[in-house]
Design a protein with these regions (language model features):
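RNA pseudouridine synthases
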Residues: 1-300
Length: 300
C-alpha cells in the first residue's frame, strides 16, 4: 500500500503510524525489515519525511479468529424479530479479537439470540455500536440487515438517545454544560484517544446529579460516538472518570475499571417506527460506591 506525506519534518516511523492503521511498533518492525520504502528507497526509522514523499508499506496479515456460541449469562432487556437490547456487564469485550477469542458479547449473542445481522462481518454479527470492555450498560443489537442499516443510520444522524452515568473526580464548577472538542488517536500513545485538532467532531453534554466533595455523579449524553469519548472528554476538562486506568489518576475509587454505565438507550424501532426507550440501573459495584460516597466512606 502507498500513502503520500502531507506534513513534513517528522520521523518516518511516526509518520507511517499517523498516516495508516499501523501501530508505532509495527511500523518500526516493517522499517527495520526493509518493508517500508520512501520514494522507492528503504530508509531508517529516524529519517525525516518531506511533504510529497510516497511511503510504501505492507498490510499485516489478518489473524483468523474462530468464534463459537457460548452459554454465557446475558441480560436481554428487550427482544423481538428485529432488535435486541442487551445490558452488557462490566468486564465483557463486545466482539472477538486476537486477544479475546471467547467470553465476548458476540459469543453470548450467538448462543442466546442466534439470528443476527451480517453487515459488520462474521466477527461482529448484530453489533451496531460498542461500549468499552470495562463500561457496563445498554447496547442495541440488530437481528437482520434491514434493522442494522436503519439503526446505524439513526446513530450517524445523531437521532439515537444515549445517556450514561459516571462517577468523576472533583467538583464540577457548573451543574450542566457541553463539551465540544474533536477526538482522534493520541500521538503520544497509539492505544489511546485524545482531544486533537486533527480529530473528528465530538460533543458530550453533562448534567450534575450529586456532589460528594472529591467526586461527582454526572449524567452524560452523547451527541457523537467517538472511541472513548466520555472518558477522553471528562479527562480533558479535568474531571476524569473514577477508576479509569487509561485516562485518570492512580489514586481513585476501587472497582473493576471505570465507573461508567450506559444507563439509557432510545431509538426509533426499524420496523414499527415507534420511538422506544430503555433504562438499566448501574451495577452493584457502582451503587455500592455511591452509597459509600454519600456516607463519606471514601474508598481510595
Amino acid at each position: 500500500m502507498e500513502v503520500r506525506v502531507e506534513i513534513g519534518g517528522i520521523r518516518l516511523d511516526k509518520a507511517l503510524a499517523d498516516l495508516t492503521d499501523l501501530s508505532r511498533s509495527v511500523a518500526n518492525e516493517q522499517i527495520k525489515n526493509g518493508q517500508v520504502l520512501v520514494n522507492g528507497q528503504p530508509k531508517k526509522a529516524k529519517y525525516s519525511v518531506q511533504v510529497g514523499d510516497v511511503l510504501t508499506y505492507q498490510i499485516p496479515e489478518v489473524e483468523e479468529i474462530d468464534y463459537v456460541a457460548e452459554d454465557i449469562p446475558l441480560e436481554i432487556v428487550f427482544q423481538d424479530e428485529d432488535v435486541a437490547v442487551i445490558n452488557k456487564p462490566q468486564g465483557m469485550v463486545v466482539h472477538p479479537s486476537a486477544g479475546h477469542t471467547s467470553g465476548t458479547l458476540v459469543n453470548a449473542l450467538l448462543y442466546h439470540v442466534k439470528d443476527l445481522s451480517g453487515i459488520n462481518g462474521v466477527l461482529r454479527p448484530g453489533i451496531v455500536h460498542r461500549i468499552d470492555k470495562d463500561t457496563s450498560g445498554l447496547l442495541m443489537i440488530a437481528k437482520n440487515d434491514d434493522a442494522h442499516t436503519k439503526l446505524a443510520a439513526e446513530l450517524k444522524d445523531k437521532k439515537s438517545l444515549r445517556k450514561y452515568w459516571a462517577i468523576v473526580h472533583g467538583n464540577l464548577p457548573n451543574d450542566r454544560g457541553v463539551i465540544e472538542a474533536p477526538i482522534g488517536r493520541s500521538e503520544k500513545d497509539r492505544k489511546k484517544q485524545a482531544v486533537t485538532a486533527k480529530g473528528k467532531e465530538a460533543v458530550t453534554r453533562f448534567q450534575v446529579l450529586e456532589r460528594f466533595g472529591d467526586y461527582t455523579l454526572v449524567e452524560l449524553t452523547l451527541e457523537t460516538g467517538r472511541t472513548h469519548q466520555i472518558r477522553v472528554h471528562m479527562a480533558y476538562i479535568g474531571h476524569p472518570v473514577a477508576g479509569d486506568e487509561a485516562y485518570g489518576p492512580r489514586k481513585t475509587l476501587k472497582g473493576h475499571g471505570q465507573f461508567l454505565h450506559a444507563r439509557t438507550l432510545g431509538f426509533t424501532h426499524p420496523r414499527t417506527g415507534e420511538v422506544v426507550e430503555f433504562t438499566a440501573e448501574a451495577p452493584a459495584i457502582f451503587q455500592e460506591a455511591l452509597e459509600k460516597l454519600r456516607k463519606a466512606e471514601y474508598i481510595v
